[in-house]
Amino acid sequence: MKIGPTLRRILQSAIVTCALTVGAQAQQSDLMPLHTMQDSQGWAAVGRLDIRGKGFCTAALIREQLILTAAHCVFNSDGTPIDTTLFEFRAGLRDGRAEATRSISRAVPHPGYQFKENATDAPAVALDIAVLELARPIRMARLQPYQIAPRPL
């Protein structure tokens, strides 16, 4: 699959960002529910990527029309790509309601990623990243994409 220079730069930036956070451990394990607008401040661009009949993954809005998720989320358990018509991104999900819902038009896993079920080795995990293109952009003041570097550091 060919990817353009912009998407390549986004993938490279995302890999660098992920590499900087690999190994970091949470200071506490208590999860805080996001019930109010104030609770969810700063988290609005995080959403749930629903995969009809197959579960869900977490994803983050990184451009008005692009989300970032794990590459293993876009593959079936046999390693074949999941049909993008089965995906739905629900941005700003709070108490079961999303602020924006979009279908997916294209999924691009990292070019070096090779599907391996339950992979835990660092080289495989480092490439477990994918950029998905939304069918329509999300242009809402409250749902601002996370800022990522325009190119690798």
Annotate each language-model stretch with its function.
Residues T120, M140-L153:
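Flexible, gly/ser-rich surface segments that form the specificity/activation loops bordering the active-site cleft
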Residues K2-R63, V108:
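Protease-domain processing segments flanking chymotrypsin-fold serine proteases, especially trypsin-like
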Residues Q28-Q41, F75, P81-R139:
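Conserved catalytic-core segment of clan PA serine endopeptidases
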Residues L49-F56, A91-D95, R151:
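Generic detector of contiguous secondary-structure segments
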Residues I62, I104-S105, Q144-A149:
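"Short basic amphipathic alpha-helical interaction patches in structured regions
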Residues G47, G55-F56, A70-D78, L143-Y146:
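N-terminal post-signal-peptidase region of extra-cytosolic proteins
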Residues Q65, T69:
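Cytochrome P450 catalytic-core helices
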